[in-house]
Amino acid sequence: MIQVTYYREHCRVTVEGHAHSAEPGHDLVCAGVSALAYTLAANVGNLEDGGKVRFAYARLDPGNAEIGCTPKGKNAALVGCILNAVCVGFEMLARQYPEYISYEIHG
């Protein structure tokens, strides 16, 4: 099972585990989670390149990802919007496939 956790106050998302909903290469739940994680990582990188965050990081390994950043000043709302938008996708997957993915929000 994949566990996605959104730490709202820390602008951080972790993704752990594997869905095992189909054979490797044919697992649509895994593909959906991976697409969202990579989208979030790219957006955090763009925020860093644009000077909107002080610090950004993304570690994307099979079955284990962590993505986060520290917003600069007035950019906290923008960063929150981006994180929330991607996390809606994780939440939708968890509702559709509760046997393969769980989603939690902290903070």
Q: Whereabouts are the PLM-identified features?
A:
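Short, conserved glycine- and acidic-residue-centered signature motifs
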Residues: 29-33
